[in-house]
């Protein structure tokens, strides 16, 4: 079992149950899955760029991503319907906990000029989205092999009903949110 998963089971569950006044342990919000999405950006027409995205996502997550394709044709961006755009990975169970621990302990502290994660990135249903501008902050990515920074999206899907429950859960797991300024 991962350290973060042990922390969740031993400390965070009881803390959430006490703080929100849940009567049953089944009411406690949990992290269901983490979805990581990455696109080739301006280089979509270049098939090598899409393959680089797939390889980088495989290195970052330890799981083979599936290719995402364009839904519509856009002449201004030279994109045709069905053209490969990037990759997407859904992490669950142990790989999810391993990725979340790596994200909190290693990746987020390496973000340049980091002052905390904006707590405004919740969707109203207890899910959290985080945009990472540079994939080179992941320890698996070799800086010398990157032609261009692509960035990626990380979506943490929870079973929480409200944003406050999800934020409390992620804070207790160690997510460094920025303090609210007045």
UniProtKB/Swiss-Prot annotation:
Signal peptide: none
Gene Ontology CC terms: ribonucleoprotein complex; ribosome
MF annotations from Gene Ontology: rRNA binding; structural constituent of ribosome; tRNA binding
Pfam families hit by this protein: Ribosomal_L5 (PF00281), Ribosomal_L5_C (PF00673)
Sorted UniProt keywords: Ribonucleoprotein, Ribosomal protein, RNA-binding, rRNA-binding, tRNA-binding
Keyword RNA-binding: yes
Coiled-coil blocks: none
InterPro entries recorded: Ribosomal_uL5 (IPR002132), Ribosomal_uL5_bac-type (IPR020930), Ribosomal_uL5_C (IPR031309), Ribosomal_uL5_dom_sf (IPR022803), Ribosomal_uL5_N (IPR031310)
Gene Ontology biological process terms, A to Z: translation
PANTHER family associated with the record: 60S RIBOSOMAL PROTEIN L11-RELATED (PTHR11994)
Assembly notes: Part of the 50S ribosomal subunit; part of the 5S rRNA/L5/L18/L25 subcomplex. Contacts the 5S rRNA and the P site tRNA. Forms a bridge to the 30S subunit in the 70S ribosome.
Family per record: Belongs to the universal ribosomal protein uL5 family.
Function, in words: This is one of the proteins that bind and probably mediate the attachment of the 5S RNA into the large ribosomal subunit, where it forms part of the central protuberance. In the 70S ribosome it contacts protein S13 of the 30S subunit (bridge B1b), connecting the 2 subunits; this bridge is implicated in subunit movement. Contacts the P site tRNA; the 5S rRNA and some of its associated proteins might help stabilize positioning of ribosome-bound tRNAs.
Protein name listed in UniProt: Large ribosomal subunit protein uL5
Protein species of origin: Mycoplasma mobile (strain ATCC 43663 / 163K / NCTC 11711)
């Amino acid at each position: 079992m991962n350290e973060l998963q042990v922390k969740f089971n031993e400390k965070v569950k009881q803390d959430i149950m006490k703080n929100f006044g849940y009567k049953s342990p089944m009411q406690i919000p949990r992290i269901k899955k983490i979805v990581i999405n990455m696109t080739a950006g301006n280089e979509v027409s270049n098939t090598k760029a899409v393959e680089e995205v797939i390889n980088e996502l495989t290195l970052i997550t330890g799981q083979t991503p599936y290719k995402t394709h364009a839904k519509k044709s856009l002449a201004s961006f030279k994109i045709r319907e069905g053209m490969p755009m990037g990759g997407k990975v859904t992490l669950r169970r142990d790989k999810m906990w391993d990725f979340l621990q790596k994200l909190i302990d290693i990746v987020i502290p390496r973000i340049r000029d980091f002052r905390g994660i904006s707590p405004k990135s919740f969707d109203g249903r207890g899910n959290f989205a985080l945009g990472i501008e540079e994939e080179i902050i992941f320890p698996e990515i070799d800086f010398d092999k990157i032609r261009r920074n692509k960035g990626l999206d990380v979506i943490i899907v929870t079973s929480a009903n409200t944003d406050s429950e999800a934020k409390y859960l992620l804070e207790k797991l160690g997510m460094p949110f920025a303090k609210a300024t007045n």
